[in-house]
Amino acid sequence: MAVRAQFENSNEVGVFATLTNSYAIVAIGGSENFYSVFEAELQDVIPICHASIGGTRIVGRLTAGNRKGLLVPTSTTDQELQHLRNSIPDSVKIQRVEERLSALGNVICCNDHVALIHPDLERETEEIIADVLGVEVFRQTVADNVLTGSYMALSNQGGIVHPKTSIRDQDELSSLLQVPLVAGSVNRGSPVVGAGMVVNDWLAVTGLDTTATELSVMESVFRLGEMGAKGLGMGNANKESIVESFY
């Protein structure tokens, strides 16, 4: 399902929230209806954590995570880190990352299997991403932009990239990620798809300005209409056991 929301007067949902298949993080404060959109779709399925990072509300731009792990910048206080640990499932590894490019959500785009990262991230950061998130890591650009996390939205089912991404680049990225990609926009033509929306395997939340056409592209590429969260959890478990049986 794809739904629209606004954080106060901002349509940049991906700036104020992080969404994965095992938890969601939503900025503290903000309007109740922003939080209630997440609650309506996610309650009883995954925990929703109200948080700040380094005393700011731009949690979606400062963190990067997936079902297995969560990376936060060194500006995260001990208290904030403890709050995240208390709110998020114990199976999720949480790690502070010492990195000059500290807006991790802008420089890392990942799902549960692969991460595309800013070409200039430290080698040590790359190793932490691979270890904590349990993913293969590739240094990449999206439409010649180094901010992979800003210009791409990705789930385990598919992805949307910057509208000016060439067909050749789309094909190359798609074969790295092993999921279908489309070039598209959010919030009535914004190319900053990663900051404009959040998505997991059954839900996308995007800004109020997002058009019906943009929504239908999301529902199609992320395959959001196909099954609900509970069905999807089963699907993932089955998929993993099938994959394991190959080895």
From Swiss-Prot:
Pfam families: eIF-6 (PF01912). GO terms for molecular function: ribosomal large subunit binding; translation initiation factor activity. Keywords: Cytoplasm, Initiation factor, Nucleus, Phosphoprotein, Protein biosynthesis, Ribosome biogenesis. InterPro entries: eIF6. GO terms for biological process: assembly of large subunit precursor of preribosome; cytosolic ribosome assembly; maturation of 5.8S rRNA from tricistronic rRNA transcript (SSU-rRNA, 5.8S rRNA, LSU-rRNA); maturation of LSU-rRNA from tricistronic rRNA transcript (SSU-rRNA, 5.8S rRNA, LSU-rRNA); ribosomal subunit export from nucleus. It is found in: Cytoplasm; Nucleus, Nucleolus. Its main location: cytoplasm. The keyword Protein biosynthesis applies. The modification Phosphoserine is found at residues 174-175. GO terms for cellular component: cytoplasm; nucleolus; preribosome, large subunit precursor. SUPFAM superfamilies: Pentein. It comes from the Eukaryota. The keyword Transcription regulation does not apply. Phosphorylation at Ser-174 and Ser-175 promotes nuclear export. Monomer. Associates with the 60S ribosomal subunit. Binds to the 60S ribosomal subunit and prevents its association with the 40S ribosomal subunit to form the 80S initiation complex in the cytoplasm. Is also involved in ribosome biogenesis. Associates with pre-60S subunits in the nucleus and is involved in its nuclear export. Belongs to the eIF-6 family. This is Eukaryotic translation initiation factor 6. It comes from Talaromyces stipitatus (strain ATCC 10500 / CBS 375.48 / QM 6759 / NRRL 1006). The lineage of its organism: Eukaryota, Fungi, Dikarya, Ascomycota, Pezizomycotina.
